[in-house]
Amino acid sequence: MALSLGWKAHRNHCGLLLQALRSSGLLLFPCGQCPWRGAGSFLDPEIKAFLEENTEVTSSGSLTPEIQLRLLTPRCKFWWERADLWPHSDPYWAIYWPGGQALSRYLLDNPDVVRGKSVLDLGSGCGATAIAAKMSGASRILANDIDPIAGMAITLNCELNRLNPFPILIQNILNLEQDKWDLVVLGDMFYDEDLADSLHQWLKKCFWTYRTRVLIGDPGRPQFSGHSIQHHLHKVVEYSLLESTRQENSGLTTSTVWGFQP
């Protein structure tokens, strides 16, 4: 089975690394400070070479042509290989998911939402939404993911877009003491009922403790559309997805940015 038809289906239909998400990880780059001496200086050379060889730099086929990303595309070998041949954890970071596309487009079109503010990108993946926040003038950014390879990919993607890399936390942030953020953004995270419940409670605490603004990107997955969080959402903007994204996401045609206010 091709990689694109195996591991990718989990997020679209609800599986996705729950065991890994519930385990603790590590701090790849320190929170609250920017330790880079230069783009890629903290990358393992072998993994960096592997990512550069097995991903494609692209800015087409998404809602944000301004942002270049290293992604897994049909022109990449591992798009077609058996999933078990990929030597690392499943590369969910290598797909630009539709919820993240919508969030990134919204931040680029509305820079006042993040300008001069602190932003947490929860479940950052390829880092596109954090990159959009940086491009739009956010003063402090933390990208969070559970996969160390995602952290390395985010650093490479910052380099592609001529940005100084921002801090990246590789850990299940839901298990940590909450920090104060002006804005929390999360895209494509409501793919499992248990995870959705945990996110809902964490976001409510974040809102009531710090009055943090929360924006959620989702293309209408049933685990999100049918969740009780819907009672606390208002639609901010809806985007039509490009045809290539529709084909890769089970025919989903739009992606929406939602504001959360419990």
UniProtKB/Swiss-Prot annotation:
Enzyme class, UniProt record, top EC level: transferase
Assigned keywords, A-Z: Cytoplasm, Methyltransferase, Mitochondrion, Transferase, Transit peptide
CDD domains (alphabetical): AdoMet_MTases
Cellular location(s): Cytoplasm; Mitochondrion matrix
Transit peptide: 1-38
Substrates-to-products reaction catalysed: L-lysyl-[protein] + 3 S-adenosyl-L-methionine = N(6),N(6),N(6)-trimethyl-L-lysyl-[protein] + 3 S-adenosyl-L-homocysteine + 3 H(+)
Gene3D superfamilies in alphabetical order: Vaccinia Virus protein VP39 (3.40.50.150)
GO cellular component assignments: cytoplasm; mitochondrial matrix; mitochondrion; protein-containing complex
Keyword match Translocase: no
Documented EC number(s): 2.1.1.-
Principal subcellular localisation of the protein: cytoplasm
A matching Pfam family: PrmA
Gene Ontology MF, one: heat shock protein binding
Record-level GO BP terms: methylation; negative regulation of fatty acid beta-oxidation using acyl-CoA dehydrogenase
Source superkingdom: Eukaryota
Described purpose of this protein according to its UniProt entry: Protein-lysine methyltransferase that selectively trimethylates the flavoprotein ETFB in mitochondria. Thereby, may negatively regulate the function of ETFB in electron transfer from Acyl-CoA dehydrogenases to the main respiratory chain.
Assembly and interaction partners: Interacts with HSPD1; this protein may possibly be a methylation substrate.
Family: Belongs to the methyltransferase superfamily. ETFBKMT family.
Name the UniProt record assigns to this protein: Electron transfer flavoprotein beta subunit lysine methyltransferase
Lineage of the species this protein comes from: Eukaryota, Metazoa, Chordata, Craniata, Vertebrata
